């Protein structure tokens, strides 16, 4: 993670506790407020703000639908790195698409055919927590489309998806 972006130096536990205290005092952002909160967090350089935005989205994931995916995709591609991309793919996007399987073909095709490595990684990983509900045909098709690529982060995603 060194060199990817600056950090405040706040570890995950204390950062999450600060978020919890803030939400207790100020309320949880509504679904309508989330796009602004997330975009604002991702315009900042410090990674803790990106992680906080991901934590907020993870907590609200069951309230989100496919209509939120365009601005969630913006977060995926803003200052992309494996930590935020993986959390968004598996905990947020995976939750949304499992609840709204009709949206999978459109979003999967968009991401798996993208020139953006992080969107490709998202298409490979979004089913990771689905266990027995994983669409193996879709997963293997996604993997086959990128199996020859040598990028470290794609190869790691393929390995992780296969282990799950």
State where each predicted segment sits.
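Surface-facing alpha-helical segments and adjacent helix-coil boundary elements at the starts of domains
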Residues: 1-164
């Amino acid at each position: 993670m060194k060199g990817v972006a600056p950090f405040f130096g706040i570890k995950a536990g204390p950062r999450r506790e600060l978020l919890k205290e803030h939400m207790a005092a100020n309320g949880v952002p509504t679904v309508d407020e989330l796009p602004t909160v997330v975009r604002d967090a991702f315009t900042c350089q410090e990674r803790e703000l990106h992680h906080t935005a991901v934590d907020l989205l993870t907590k609200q994931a069951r309230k989100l639908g496919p209509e939120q995916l365009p601005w969630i995709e913006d977060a995926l591609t803003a200052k992309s790195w494996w930590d935020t991309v993986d959390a968004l793919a598996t905990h947020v996007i995976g939750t949304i698409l499992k609840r709204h399987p009709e949206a999978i073909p459109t979003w999967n095709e968009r991401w798996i055919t993208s020139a953006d490595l992080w969107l490709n990684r998202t298409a490979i990983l979004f089913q990771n927590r689905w266990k027995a509900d994983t669409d193996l045909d879709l997963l293997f098709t996604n993997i086959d489309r990128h199996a020859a690529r040598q990028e470290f982060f794609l190869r790691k995603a393929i390995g992780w998806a296969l282990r799950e």
